[in-house]
Amino acid sequence: IGSEVVHYTDKPLEVGSTVTGKLDWDRRFDNMQNHTCEHIFSGLVHQKYKFENVGFHMDPDDITVDFSGEIPMEAISELEKLVNQAITQNIDLKIEFPSEEVLQAMEYRSKKELHGVVRIVTVPGCDRCACCGTHVRHSGEIGMFKILDASKHRGGTRVRFVAGERARRDYDWRVKEIAKVSALFSAKPNEI
Protein backbone atom coordinates (compact mmCIF):
# COMPACT_ATOMS: atom_id res chain seq x y z
CA ILE A 1 0.00 0.00 0.00
CA GLY A 2 1.70 3.17 -1.15
CA SER A 3 5.42 2.64 -0.66
CA GLU A 4 4.96 -0.06 2.01
CA VAL A 5 4.91 -3.80 1.49
CA VAL A 6 1.87 -5.33 3.20
CA HIS A 7 1.48 -9.01 4.09
CA TYR A 8 -1.93 -10.39 5.06
CA THR A 9 -2.08 -13.15 7.66
CA ASP A 10 -4.77 -15.60 8.69
CA LYS A 11 -4.55 -14.44 12.34
CA PRO A 12 -3.32 -11.34 14.19
CA LEU A 13 0.35 -11.08 15.13
CA GLU A 14 1.63 -9.77 18.45
CA VAL A 15 3.58 -6.54 18.17
CA GLY A 16 7.30 -7.34 18.41
CA SER A 17 6.90 -11.03 17.58
CA THR A 18 9.24 -12.68 15.10
CA VAL A 19 7.70 -14.05 11.93
CA THR A 20 9.11 -16.08 9.09
CA GLY A 21 7.93 -15.83 5.51
CA LYS A 22 8.32 -18.64 3.03
CA LEU A 23 8.69 -18.03 -0.70
CA ASP A 24 7.56 -20.69 -3.16
CA TRP A 25 10.69 -20.34 -5.30
CA ASP A 26 9.64 -22.76 -8.05
CA ARG A 27 6.39 -20.85 -8.61
CA ARG A 28 8.13 -17.47 -8.38
CA PHE A 29 10.88 -18.44 -10.84
CA ASP A 30 8.31 -19.91 -13.25
CA ASN A 31 6.42 -16.60 -13.17
CA MET A 32 9.68 -14.66 -13.61
CA GLN A 33 10.63 -16.72 -16.68
CA ASN A 34 7.24 -16.39 -18.34
CA HIS A 35 6.68 -12.73 -17.47
CA THR A 36 10.12 -11.71 -18.74
CA CYS A 37 9.53 -13.72 -21.91
CA GLU A 38 6.22 -11.89 -22.40
CA HIS A 39 8.17 -8.61 -22.28
CA ILE A 40 10.61 -9.83 -24.93
CA PHE A 41 7.83 -11.13 -27.19
CA SER A 42 5.55 -8.09 -26.76
CA GLY A 43 8.49 -5.74 -27.25
CA LEU A 44 9.50 -7.42 -30.50
CA VAL A 45 5.89 -7.37 -31.75
CA HIS A 46 5.74 -3.66 -30.90
CA GLN A 47 9.06 -2.96 -32.68
CA LYS A 48 8.02 -4.81 -35.82
CA TYR A 49 4.30 -3.97 -36.05
CA LYS A 50 3.70 -1.11 -33.55
CA PHE A 51 0.92 -3.20 -31.97
CA GLU A 52 0.14 -2.76 -28.29
CA ASN A 53 -0.26 -5.55 -25.78
CA VAL A 54 -3.93 -5.07 -24.83
CA GLY A 55 -4.43 -8.21 -22.74
CA PHE A 56 -2.23 -10.53 -20.72
CA HIS A 57 -3.12 -13.62 -18.69
CA MET A 58 -0.78 -15.98 -16.84
CA ASP A 59 -2.52 -19.33 -16.46
CA PRO A 60 -0.72 -22.13 -14.56
CA ASP A 61 -0.23 -23.94 -17.89
CA ASP A 62 0.38 -21.19 -20.45
CA ILE A 63 0.43 -17.46 -21.12
CA THR A 64 -2.06 -15.60 -23.31
CA VAL A 65 -1.27 -12.21 -24.84
CA ASP A 66 -3.66 -10.15 -26.95
CA PHE A 67 -2.33 -7.58 -29.42
CA SER A 68 -4.10 -4.57 -30.92
CA GLY A 69 -3.50 -5.60 -34.54
CA GLU A 70 -3.35 -8.67 -36.75
CA ILE A 71 0.09 -10.25 -36.79
CA PRO A 72 0.54 -12.10 -40.09
CA MET A 73 0.35 -15.82 -39.28
CA GLU A 74 3.42 -16.48 -41.43
CA ALA A 75 5.39 -14.13 -39.13
CA ILE A 76 4.62 -16.06 -35.93
CA SER A 77 7.47 -18.59 -36.31
CA GLU A 78 9.93 -15.78 -37.13
CA LEU A 79 8.92 -13.94 -33.95
CA GLU A 80 9.37 -17.17 -31.98
CA LYS A 81 12.86 -17.52 -33.46
CA LEU A 82 13.74 -13.91 -32.51
CA VAL A 83 12.59 -14.46 -28.92
CA ASN A 84 14.69 -17.63 -28.63
CA GLN A 85 17.69 -15.75 -30.05
CA ALA A 86 17.25 -13.09 -27.36
CA ILE A 87 17.13 -15.84 -24.73
CA THR A 88 20.31 -17.45 -26.12
CA GLN A 89 22.10 -14.08 -26.04
CA ASN A 90 21.68 -14.04 -22.23
CA ILE A 91 20.88 -10.32 -22.21
CA ASP A 92 21.22 -8.50 -18.88
CA LEU A 93 17.92 -6.88 -17.89
CA LYS A 94 18.03 -3.33 -16.63
CA ILE A 95 15.72 -2.05 -13.88
CA GLU A 96 15.58 1.68 -13.27
CA PHE A 97 13.49 4.30 -11.51
CA PRO A 98 13.99 7.40 -13.68
CA SER A 99 13.19 10.90 -12.49
CA GLU A 100 9.94 12.40 -13.78
CA GLU A 101 11.97 14.55 -16.20
CA VAL A 102 13.86 11.59 -17.63
CA LEU A 103 10.67 9.51 -17.78
CA GLN A 104 8.87 12.18 -19.83
CA ALA A 105 11.61 12.05 -22.47
CA MET A 106 12.01 8.26 -22.38
CA GLU A 107 10.64 5.98 -25.11
CA TYR A 108 8.91 2.99 -23.57
CA ARG A 109 6.02 0.68 -24.32
CA SER A 110 2.63 1.08 -22.64
CA LYS A 111 2.75 4.77 -21.81
CA LYS A 112 -0.19 5.31 -19.51
CA GLU A 113 -0.88 8.12 -17.10
CA LEU A 114 1.59 7.14 -14.37
CA HIS A 115 2.17 9.03 -11.13
CA GLY A 116 4.89 8.80 -8.51
CA VAL A 117 7.89 6.53 -8.80
CA VAL A 118 7.80 4.51 -12.03
CA ARG A 119 9.82 1.33 -12.49
CA ILE A 120 11.13 0.77 -16.02
CA VAL A 121 12.22 -2.73 -17.07
CA THR A 122 14.48 -2.87 -20.12
CA VAL A 123 15.56 -5.92 -22.10
CA PRO A 124 18.12 -4.19 -24.37
CA GLY A 125 17.30 -4.63 -28.04
CA CYS A 126 13.87 -6.09 -27.25
CA ASP A 127 11.73 -4.06 -24.90
CA ARG A 128 11.44 -1.15 -22.50
CA CYS A 129 8.26 -1.02 -20.45
CA ALA A 130 6.87 0.34 -17.18
CA CYS A 131 6.37 -2.73 -14.99
CA CYS A 132 6.18 -3.69 -11.32
CA GLY A 133 6.39 -7.46 -11.92
CA THR A 134 9.12 -9.97 -11.13
CA HIS A 135 11.73 -10.77 -13.77
CA VAL A 136 14.84 -12.87 -14.31
CA ARG A 137 18.16 -11.00 -14.25
CA HIS A 138 19.44 -12.38 -17.56
CA SER A 139 17.36 -13.55 -20.54
CA GLY A 140 19.23 -16.86 -20.61
CA GLU A 141 17.50 -17.82 -17.36
CA ILE A 142 14.28 -18.21 -19.37
CA GLY A 143 15.65 -21.28 -21.15
CA MET A 144 13.26 -21.63 -24.06
CA PHE A 145 10.11 -20.17 -25.61
CA LYS A 146 7.42 -21.88 -27.68
CA ILE A 147 4.29 -20.44 -29.27
CA LEU A 148 1.43 -22.92 -28.90
CA ASP A 149 -1.23 -21.08 -30.85
CA ALA A 150 -1.94 -17.78 -32.60
CA SER A 151 -5.31 -16.65 -33.88
CA LYS A 152 -7.29 -13.60 -34.88
CA HIS A 153 -9.15 -12.18 -31.91
CA ARG A 154 -11.38 -9.08 -31.71
CA GLY A 155 -9.64 -7.30 -34.56
CA GLY A 156 -6.21 -8.20 -33.23
CA THR A 157 -4.17 -11.30 -32.50
CA ARG A 158 -4.22 -13.67 -29.52
CA VAL A 159 -1.05 -15.66 -28.88
CA ARG A 160 -0.65 -18.52 -26.40
CA PHE A 161 2.86 -19.51 -25.40
CA VAL A 162 5.00 -21.25 -22.82
CA ALA A 163 8.50 -20.45 -21.64
CA GLY A 164 11.07 -21.85 -19.25
CA GLU A 165 10.13 -24.95 -17.29
CA ARG A 166 6.58 -24.76 -18.68
CA ALA A 167 8.01 -25.09 -22.20
CA ARG A 168 10.16 -28.06 -21.18
CA ARG A 169 7.15 -29.80 -19.59
CA ASP A 170 5.02 -29.08 -22.66
CA TYR A 171 7.72 -30.46 -24.98
CA ASP A 172 8.10 -33.56 -22.79
CA TRP A 173 4.33 -34.16 -22.90
CA ARG A 174 4.23 -33.75 -26.70
CA VAL A 175 7.13 -36.18 -27.22
CA LYS A 176 5.34 -38.78 -25.08
CA GLU A 177 2.06 -38.29 -26.95
CA ILE A 178 3.80 -38.63 -30.33
CA ALA A 179 5.48 -41.82 -29.08
CA LYS A 180 2.06 -43.26 -28.16
CA VAL A 181 0.61 -42.47 -31.59
CA SER A 182 3.78 -43.77 -33.25
CA ALA A 183 3.46 -47.08 -31.39
CA LEU A 184 -0.25 -47.30 -32.18
CA PHE A 185 0.42 -47.04 -35.92
CA SER A 186 3.75 -48.92 -35.84
CA ALA A 187 5.39 -45.94 -37.49
CA LYS A 188 8.37 -43.77 -36.74
CA PRO A 189 7.46 -40.43 -35.11
CA ASN A 190 8.45 -38.51 -38.25
CA GLU A 191 6.16 -40.74 -40.36
CA ILE A 192 2.90 -40.04 -38.53
Placement of each model-derived feature along the sequence:
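Active-/binding-site microenvironments in catalytic and ligand-binding cores
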Residues: 1-192
